[in-house]
Design a protein with these regions (language model features):
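Active-site nucleotide/adenylate-binding loops and adjacent lid/helix of ATP-dependent enzymes
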Residues: 2-12, 16, 24, 116-205, ...
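Hydrophobic beta-strand scaffold residues
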Residues: 40, 105-106, 134, 161, ...
Length: 329
């Protein structure tokens, strides 16, 4: 008897500044999935508008009671959700909690992991306890800005430094601050994106990004990508408007490559991650490896880091996605 195809929802959109980027990731994923094996649909969610795209340019409303929809007069349920939302609610645990409630398997880590990795300050403090090197930082909450003076920031963190939203899925609201006069406007800018912001030590070195995924029977750490930008830092403009050179595999020594791969696998296990994640690092001239960020819903356009790294590893995105989906069954 022929096995029925699983119905896969590529869940995209979301309520963050990166809504449109998420739609591009969804199109990339749609092109990568094995459609001989799966029925693949794109589900766009924004606020209260949840809908699935159907052939012929029509859409159908998603019933949030069970994440079903009606096609050709028949109710259809999904077997699996591949989440590619950058920011809320797909990268901070909210959507994961909903899928847990209705019993739908999904591609990302669970609620706790998503919530923790979304809050950069919390993540840094947690991983520091496991011996992972991270930049020094301090937290400022909206309404309590006066509790931390500019002089204290300069003394504790130093200049230059970064001011960024503590909980946000993008590079929006991030500023590189070179002197105390730039702190107040940078803090205001970051607080437009998040009520909690972090002031983070500037680390000089080579920036790299590396993907990893694990299943019941394999552990795959992908080749790293080196990020070279003419901008002050790897901001939104550099990330999405081509203001960056991406070198895969990164130009690293054998020793640094080995250590980065070991740390990446270790962080995946510490956090109890699921699916494919991407971790960003700064590597100093002396070879010190400092973790910058853990991205649990990495971009999936054909030119994004993960597809680049999969190609560099001699793998096919189709097979990687099949590994990730089937690991839940």
């Amino acid at each position: 008897m022929k096995h029925l195809k699983r119905n896969i929802a590529i869940v995209c959109g979301g309520d963050s500044s990166e809504h449109d980027v998420s739609l591009r990731s969804a199109q990339g994923l749609y092109s990568f999935f094995d459609t001989e094996r799966y029925n693949v649909y794109i589900v766009d969610i924004k606020g209260q508008d949840w809908h699935v795209e159907l052939p012929g340019g029509i859409t159908a409303r998603i019933d949030r009671n069970d994440f079903s929809f009606v096609e050709d007069g028949k109710a259809k349920l999904f077997d699996y959700a591949y989440i590619t939302i950058h920011g809320t609610p797909g990268e901070n645990g909210l959507l994961q909690g909903y899928f847990d409630l209705i019993g739908l398997p999904y591609s990302t880590s669970g609620v706790l992991v998503e919530a923790m990795t979304f809050d950069k300050f919390v993540l840094n403090q947690y991983l520091r306890g496991y011996g992972v090197s991270v930049a020094d930082s301090l937290l400022i909450r909206q309404g309590y800005e006066e509790l931390v003076s500019d002089d204290e920031i300069e003394q504790r963190i130093g200049m230059p430094c970064f001011v960024k939203p503590a909980a946000d899925g993008s590079s929006f609201g991030v500023s590189k601050v070179k002197n105390k006069d730039q702190l107040a406007p940078a803090i205001r800018k970051a607080m437009l994106e998040s009520p909690e912001i972090m002031v983070e030590q500037f680390l000089e070195g080579t920036e790299i990004s590396i993907g990893v995924y694990k299943t019941h029977d394999k552990s795959v750490v992908l080749p790293a990508t080196e990020v070279v930008t003419a901008n002050e830092f790897f901001d939104y403009d550099a990330k999405y408007n081509g203001q960056v050179q991406e070198i895969t595999p990164a130009r690293l020594s054998e020793d640094v490559t080995r250590r980065v791969r070991e740390i990446t696998s270790h962080i995946y296990d510490i956090l109890h991650c699921n699916g494919i994640i991407r971790i960003d690092y700064i590597i100093s001239k002396e070879g010190k490896i400092s973790m910058l960020e853990v991205n649990t819903t990495p971009g999936m356009t054909p030119t994004s880091f993960i597809p680049q790294q999969v190609r560099a590893a001699g793998l096919e995105m189709k097979d990687v996605l099949t590994d990730i989906v089937e690991n839940q069954f």
